[in-house]
């Protein structure tokens, strides 16, 4: 119990240190046309509903998982609030969704991501409410599902590599989707959607690849700490999804 309290305190401390003047999250308020903002919101809704159902099931079966859910949410909040300016209307930053995906599966991350993004929009002026659906879809839905599939595919062969790749891939896929969302909303005048997508991806790659690698390493460290706590009988990471 002592270890998880130390981890929780460390994450909370980092939240307090998160600069409130940091750039907006993936796509800033008003940067998407209303039609695209609505489309991404509608697409995201079923996953959010499914996520609430999954979280209820997890907490009903194991009430002590509430603390771990809170820790995962704080981890996402901190990492996704650390931003580097990238493309106009967007930024590069870790996503933090890999850890929760590995522990709880992808559906709960839709809810956790939604909550984190709302708090960032309202309290830190990161991103916005109109672009919430798009940001949830890229960071809290597609990213976690991509990370989950790679984790499940190789976890029995090499658990550490699976954790690292899941976190890294969840991060990178998020930015591929974000680039597509921006390209669909703002196609290039000459080369259309493909040209715009290529431009956004090219600029994102400069900062996002190193960030994704770093996130993979950090996620592996935190996961290993939780595994050590699991050995003390705190919870069973294998029965959360």
UniProtKB/Swiss-Prot annotation:
It comes from the Bacteria. The keyword Transport applies. Pathway: Cofactor biosynthesis; adenosylcobalamin biosynthesis. One of its GO terms (molecular function) is cobalt ion transmembrane transporter activity. GO terms for biological process: cobalamin biosynthetic process. Residues 1-24 form the signal peptide. InterPro entries: CbiM, CbiM/NikMN. Keywords: Cell membrane, Cobalamin biosynthesis, Cobalt, Cobalt transport, Ion transport, Membrane, Signal, Transmembrane, Transmembrane helix, Transport. It is found in: Cell membrane. GO terms for cellular component: ATP-binding cassette (ABC) transporter complex. Part of the energy-coupling factor (ECF) transporter complex CbiMNOQ involved in cobalt import. Belongs to the CbiM family. Forms an energy-coupling factor (ECF) transporter complex composed of an ATP-binding protein (A component, CbiO), a transmembrane protein (T component, CbiQ) and 2 possible substrate-capture proteins (S components, CbiM and CbiN) of unknown stoichimetry. This is Cobalt transport protein CbiM. It comes from Acetoanaerobium sticklandii (strain ATCC 12662 / DSM 519 / JCM 1433 / CCUG 9281 / NCIMB 10654 / HF) (Clostridium sticklandii).
């Amino acid at each position: 119990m002592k270890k998880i309290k130390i981890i929780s305190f460390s994450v909370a401390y980092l939240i307090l240190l998160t600069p409130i003047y940091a750039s907006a999250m993936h796509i800033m308020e008003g940067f998407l046309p209303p039609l695209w903002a609505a489309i991404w919101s509608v697409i995201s809704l079923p996953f959010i509903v499914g996520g609430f159902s999954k979280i209820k099931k997890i907490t009903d079966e194991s009430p002590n998982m509430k603390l771990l859910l809170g820790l995962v949410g704080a981890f996402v909040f901190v990492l996704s609030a650390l931003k580097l300016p990238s493309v106009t209307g967007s930024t590069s930053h870790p996503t933090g969704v890999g850890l929760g995906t590995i522990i709880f599966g992808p559906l709960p991350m839709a809810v956790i991501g939604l909550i984190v993004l709302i708090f960032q929009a309202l309290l830190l002026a990161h991103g916005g409410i109109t672009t919430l659906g798009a940001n949830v879809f890229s960071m809290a839905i597609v990213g976690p599902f991509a990370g989950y599939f790679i984790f499940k595919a190789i976890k029995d062969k090499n658990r550490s590599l699976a954790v690292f790749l899941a976190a890294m891939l969840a991060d990178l896929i998020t930015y591929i989707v974000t680039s597509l969302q921006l390209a669909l909303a703002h196609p290039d005048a000459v080369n259309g959607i493909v040209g715009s997508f290529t431009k956004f991806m090219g600029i994102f790659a400069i900062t996002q690849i190193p960030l994704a690698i770093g996130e993979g390493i950090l996620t592996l460290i935190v996961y290993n700490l939780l595994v050590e706590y699991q050995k003390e009988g705190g919870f069973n990471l294998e029965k959360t999804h």
